[in-house]
Swiss-Prot record:
Plays a role in virus cell tropism, and may be required for efficient virus replication in macrophages. Keywords: Early protein. InterPro entries: ASFV_MGF360 (IPR002595). Belongs to the asfivirus MGF 360 family. Induction: Expressed in the early phase of the viral replicative cycle. This is Protein MGF 360-8L. The lineage of its organism: Viruses, Varidnaviria, Bamfordvirae, Nucleocytoviricota, Pokkesviricetes. It holds the Pfam family ASFV_360. GO terms for biological process: taxis. The keyword Transport does not apply.
Length: 319
């Protein structure tokens, strides 16, 4: 059960306190990264005031790991009292004092890389992906990540796309993997986290959105002009995985060469994509004879999803 003092601090952190009273918050320990600690009214998230996540929500578990890396004892105690999970704390504690505090608060001793990685990635959530990143990123307390140890998990999720993440630096591979998982499972907070943290990987985000059929993120990238890729190359990526109807259609509407797409699908032996591309070719050549389900020139991802959610490829087109 939370103490009265802990509950009071939590209640105050959920209020909007005028700047002239910030000294009181600092005195009460509601202070972190030179700003008042703000909590979401309806969830267990900290509202960050520092860049690059200004105004964004960060789960208490992730915020706790950040505080542990900073050796901020008061904030570590505070977040743990508020319900943050200290389980992984010892993996990030950089001093003996911080390690001892984490032990007292219930952190698990002796965790290895594989246990941490597998435990967090078992459930694909924004919180788990960001937490996994924060634990391993710039962490001298852990051994260097071994790609081979986690190879089975990575290959299962990325399939052929795994060849695009090869790098001489293991951490770069894992960052790309976490980013890809965020896009694949449409985890908006995690996508934004990696976009803000790794601005140089915007092309990777685009490639993941296309390959994993995330037309919503693809549309956002295209509308905001975050990064540019040749439209026919985008279509080739979309055709690499079968049933990628959403991103294939989006690339088609943007002007990708549908004949080239048909060739690519044949090369990959993706029959369902092939039938779909042939239907799109019919739509382009003669709207009247095309399948009634398909409509031309739609770029709204919600409308594309609604249009194609019941689409079933047929073998009516000759190969």
């Amino acid at each position: 059960m939370l103490s009265l003092q802990t509950l009071a601090k939590k209640a105050v952190a959920k209020q909007s306190v005028p700047e002239e009273y910030h000294y009181i918050l600092k005195y009460c320990g509601l202070w972190w990264q030179n700003k008042p600690i703000s909590l979401c009214h309806y969830c267990n998230y900290v509202i960050l005031s520092s860049t690059p996540f200004k105004g964004e929500l960060l789960h208490l578990d992730v915020a706790l790991i950040m505080a542990i890396k900073e050796n901020n004892y008061d904030v570590i105690r505070l977040f743990t009292e508020w319900g943050a999970n200290i389980y992984y704390g010892l993996t990030c504690a950089r001093t003996e004092q911080t390690q001892e505090l984490c032990r007292k608060l219930g952190a698990k001793d002796g965790l290895n890389n594989k246990e941490i990685f597998a435990g967090l990635m078992r459930h694909k959530t924004s919180n788990n992906i960001i937490l996994c990143h924060e634990i391993f990123d710039k962490n001298p307390m852990l051994e260097a990540l071994n790609v081979q140890e986690m190879g089975e998990e990575i290959h299962r999720e990325l399939k052929l796309f795994i060849f695009y993440i090869l790098d001489n630096v293991p951490m770069n591979i894992f960052v790309k993997y976490w980013y890809a998982i965020a896009v694949k499972y449409k985890l908006k907070r995690a996508i934004f986290f990696f976009y803000q943290t790794y601005g140089h990987l915007s092309m990777w985000r685009l490639m993941c959105a296309i390959y994993f059929n995330n037309v919503f993120d693809l549309h956002e990238i295209y509308e905001q002009k975050i990064v540019h890729m040749d439209i026919d190359k985008m279509m080739q990526l979309a055709c690499m995985q079968d049933y990628n109807f959403l991103t294939i259609y989006y690339c088609f509407v943007l002007g990708a060469d549908i004949d080239q797409a048909i060739t690519v699908t044949q090369w990959h032996y993706h029959t369902n994509n092939l039938y779909f591309c042939k239907d799109l070719k019919d739509l382009k050549q003669n709207t009247l004879t095309a399948r009634p389900l398909l409509l031309p020139n739609i770029t709204d991802p919600k409308k594309i999803y609604t249009m194609l959610k019941n689409y079933l490829p047929t073998s009516s087109n000759s190969l």
